[in-house]
Amino acid sequence: MTQMTIGHLYTSLHAGCASAVARVLEAHEVEVEFVDLDPEDIEDALEQGEVDLLVSAWFPRDEKFSGPGSRVIGDLYQPQISFAALKALGPVNTLTSADVDRVIVADDSREALEKALKQLPALSALPMEVVGEAALIARLEKAQSEGEAPLVVATQPHAVFHASLLALVEDPGQLLGGEMSARMILREDVARKADTDLLDELSEMMLGNKVMSALDYMIGVEGQDPDEAAEAWQRGRLIPRDA
């Protein structure tokens, strides 16, 4: 197979992941094209053959995208919605308004937070502020400079977890849900034509949350092109914090 189209969400996180996967394809002499997708476009793009490889789907949340004409491969990183704070705190179920004064939640994590707050009555009355994923670092830097004490809810990986702003807050009851698996969805007709060594390499490819947070930071905060960030990863120049 000489050409493959990668579909991915338009965020810096997913663009970085797609570019890293493209590096593996190109090493096997596969020409790569990219298609940016809105979340509501993914299912149609797969069904209509507009993309050959979706990078990436978060399982089990995105199982609906893996129909009978597709093959699910790999385990690139492990997304998880997490509680965090600007300083070390005890487990989330022990916190009160004496410990935190507000909740700042990334937009993609809001639904999970609203469910969790039903089991956290001591925190449910706190003011909630929803911010876009791209605006989270700036908002937390402002909170830090103004002496605020927010409880933060965001999905790892994210650039904010590369910026050394946050300490994770333990969630012993997994109120935000458990760890997911970022996997690739390959059209079955494409998989049958693909080189078996390539499929094996994609299946074994591991980026991990720290690398993905670093990629997200390089692209979303430092403004690097996703291909340049992927090259830095491939050449070992991308160093995750606390690696």
Q: What is each of the regions a protein language model found here?
A:
Residues 55-67, 142-169:
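A ligand-binding cleft/hinge motif common to bilobed small-molecule-binding domains
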Residues 70-77, 153, 163-178:
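Short beta-strand->loop
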Residues 71-114:
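A conserved helix-loop-strand patch within extracytoplasmic ligand-binding domains
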Residues 20-28, 97-99, 105-130, 232-235:
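Ligand-binding cleft/hinge of the Venus flytrap
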Residues 12, 33-47, 128-142:
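Short helix-initiation/N-cap motifs at beta->coil->alpha
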Residues 2, 135-145, 152-154, 158-161, ...:
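An extracytoplasmic/periplasmic, membrane-proximal ligand-sensing/linker region
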Residues 1-13, 30-35, 100-104, 202:
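Short, well-ordered beta-strand elements
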Residues 82-93, 180-196:
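A bilobed periplasmic-binding-protein/Venus flytrap-type ligand-binding module shared by bacterial periplasmic
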